């Protein structure tokens, strides 16, 4: 019994030592594990949030890049369309108008009407002086004078028209005032282009 009592005491002592040393260590280990789990949980949550932030940022960057690319394409398309319109205007409108004017403005009857209109405009303003009329270099002065008649040619310094250095149309010079009233084909082309260009664009490009 004495031996058992000694064993019991030894057991009690071991249990007491275990209780005093292991239990606090177990509690400390449990606390460490709990803290580690909480910290790991926070790290995982923060990692998820950071990953989502990176994804959102990448999506926004990609979206902005796409929008910039789309805007650049739209702008390039607008520039190409405008260049095409200008090319069409130059080729179809201005060149065709120029060809038509070259034909019309070299007609003696048309040249005579232009000279007559210029002389009458000067008379209507009460302007007097030596008047010199010029017609296009490809127009017959004789044919124009015949079409004008003496009523108009008598008002001209040379009693008739002279040939100028322009293609077609007419010019009237008021010498005392150093005025030149210009209705040459070149000036008429610019005038008609300005007046008709808007209508031409609307007619041709209304669906663009």
From Swiss-Prot:
Keyword Ion transport found: yes
Molecular function terms, GO-annotated: ATP binding; proton-transporting ATP synthase activity, rotational mechanism; proton-transporting ATPase activity, rotational mechanism
GO cellular component terms attached to this protein's record: proton-transporting two-sector ATPase complex, catalytic domain
Transmembrane feature ranges: none
Free-text function comment from the UniProt entry: Produces ATP from ADP in the presence of a proton gradient across the membrane.
Family: Belongs to the V-ATPase E subunit family.
Entries under NCBIfam families matching the protein: PRK01005.1 (NF002170)
Entry protein name: V-type ATP synthase subunit E
The organism of origin for this protein: Chlamydia trachomatis serovar D (strain ATCC VR-885 / DSM 19411 / UW-3/Cx)
Gene giving rise to this polypeptide: atpE
